[in-house]
Amino acid sequence: MMAATVVSRIRTGTRWAPVLWLLLSLVAVAAAVAAEQQVPLVLWSSDRDLWAPVADTHEGHITSDMQLSTYLDPALELGPRNVLLFLQDKLSIEDFTAYGGVFGNKQDSAFSNLENALDLAPSSLVLPAVDWYAISTLTTYLQEKLGASPLHVDLATLKELKLNASLPALLLIRLPYTASSGLMAPREVLTGNDEVIGQVLSTLESEDVPYTAALTAVRPSRVARDVAMVAGGLGRQLLQTQVASPAIHPPVSYNDTAPRILFWAQNFSVAYKDEWKDLTSLTFGVENLNLTGSFWNDSFAMLSLTYEPLFGATVTFKFILASRFYPVSARYWFTMERLEIHSNGSVAHFNVSQVTGPSIYSFHCEYVSSLSKKGSLLVTNVPSLWQMTLHNFQIQAFNVTGEQFSYASDCAGFFSPGIWMGLLTTLFMLFIFTYGLHMILSLKTMDRFDDRKGPTITLTQIV
């Protein structure tokens, strides 16, 4: 990580442990923050006292663009006018942890030249997590502050340049990074980048040119785990397998001059003669999905999905919807008239009239299926060889704006099994309470042996 480079400045064993533990805690915290939005930044200069110790590198802190400008302004105004920007394609603080030799294996470090530069630099600053937006505008910011255009250089062109301490210069050195196990391993690439940094700095030092250098990346090379990793403890997470989040595919969109019909389902499965096929991956997120036959107008719409081959034939699914005005509610309502499955010249019809709602809304239902155990919203008048199940089904064919669904009218009725259970339980408890209250109010004093008109009962005490 970024902080691992600072560790190299501490040579004695007595000072190693506390600093190492502090920096490793920064690694754990930065790994828990959304790393796809932050990259590390290392700054060092040949001038002294350009940066005060950073007080904001506490747990979870991310350096914003405004904070970064407060760190850079003193160096650009008071420091050397020659600025080097080592810009890597990908870099994360985890790279410094994995390949920086922070556990004492200094001979295996892939950042030996960078660590040596930080050791010898009179001024340095390490920011483990900088906001991606701040880094994306860093080159433009440096250009405005220095008043010099960025010059892309390599080792060959750098040796030919004659830098002047009084004239501003912004030198941009691009460093590659390969995170895959392709032609080169990440350690080899990082080591090669570190050698480039060492050669560039050696060239400047040989010419006795003062400079300020920065190392950062365009984007992170790794994606950190969830923030819950810190709250739950790192120890238990080390051997656990990270569960991949399910991919969210975009809805099917039928367009003529604008998006007209939107259709989405988390799972789209069809069966013919009890042989099931999952059409989800063939339907959503597919650029060349066959929508031939689809059409739309203000009162009628049809979404036609054609697959070939499917069950050994060309199969077309047609979702037919209509929008009508109802005077009672004084608004337009849409209804899915039917669902048709065309195959080998035959047509299977399903009645889907329960798929309905105001035309300004979309329709959503957890299950739209021909199976009885999943609601049977797809109803056929005659026995059919076809079955269909749509999980988390959503459709909108009228008043579509852009590629997003409107507010959804859900199929869940008010008197669901859970609601019935709650109502019956409440009524039963209310009956018990009413009966108990009635019994309490019906209590009477025991006056059976108390005759107020008769003689007084006298009890003689016998000793």
From Swiss-Prot:
Residues 33-225 form a propeptide. Its main location: endoplasmic reticulum. Expressed in brain (at protein level). It holds the Pfam family Ac45-VOA1_TM. GO terms for cellular component: clathrin-coated vesicle membrane; endoplasmic reticulum membrane; endoplasmic reticulum-Golgi intermediate compartment membrane; endosome membrane; membrane; proton-transporting V-type ATPase complex; synaptic vesicle membrane. InterPro entries: Ac45_acc_su, VAS1/VOA1_TM, VAS1_LD. Keywords: Cytoplasmic vesicle, Endoplasmic reticulum, Glycoprotein, Hydrogen ion transport, Ion transport, Membrane, Signal, Synapse, Transmembrane, Transmembrane helix, Transport. One of its GO terms (molecular function) is small GTPase binding. GO terms for biological process: cellular response to increased oxygen levels; endosome to plasma membrane protein transport; intracellular iron ion homeostasis; osteoclast development; regulation of cellular pH; synaptic vesicle lumen acidification. Gene3D superfamilies: 2.40.160.110. The record marks 225-226 as: Cleavage. It is found in: Endoplasmic reticulum membrane; Endoplasmic reticulum-Golgi intermediate compartment membrane; Cytoplasmic vesicle, Secretory vesicle, Synaptic vesicle membrane; Cytoplasmic vesicle, Clathrin-coated vesicle membrane. Residues 1-32 form the signal peptide. Glycans are attached at residues 164, 255, 267, 290, 297, 344, 351, 399. Residues 434-463 are cytoplasmic. Accessory component of the multisubunit proton-transporting vacuolar (V)-ATPase protein pump. Interacts (via N-terminus) with ATP6AP2 (via N-terminus). Interacts with RNASEK. Interacts with TMEM106B (via C-terminus). Belongs to the vacuolar ATPase subunit S1 family. Accessory subunit of the proton-transporting vacuolar (V)-ATPase protein pump, which is required for luminal acidification of secretory vesicles. Guides the V-type ATPase into specialized subcellular compartments, such as neuroendocrine regulated secretory vesicles or the ruffled border of the osteoclast, thereby regulating its activity. Involved in membrane trafficking and Ca(2+)-dependent membrane fusion. May play a role in the assembly of the V-type ATPase complex. This is V-type proton ATPase subunit S1. The lineage of its organism: Eukaryota, Metazoa, Chordata, Craniata, Vertebrata.
